[in-house]
Amino acid sequence: LVVWSIVLARIDANHSRLPNGLTVPPALVALAACVASPYLAWGLAWPAAYLVGPGMGGGDVKLAAPLGVLLAALGGPFAVLAAVGLAGLLTVVRGWMAGRAALPHGPQMLAAAWAVGTFVGLKSSIAATL
């Protein structure tokens, strides 16, 4: 997952594209996981949020599905919503710092997913030891 995340972030940052070969297979696995476990469907809130408004590319939607489902498995709806909010905040801050409105969103999505996933994992580990 680390290598996949780094590769996607670099490609999107340099070319403003998320390749189908790296986003479609995980998105399909995420959809299959939602069929197997409806609780994981909370993860589809992330790509659904991008379908509502303009500005997000199809690659962002395909990336959001596996990230959202993985976070739903780790921390439920809260983890998904926290990552969506953090990704948006990171994108706004990065755009402000770069002085432009249009920029790739994938790197911030991946950073947010890793941050929230790490937090949820640490929280679960600490709770398990108490």
Name these PLM-found stretches.
Residues 33-36, 97, 118-119:
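Helix-loop junctions at the membrane-solvent interface of multi-pass transporters
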Residues 93-116:
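Interfacial loop-to-transmembrane junctions
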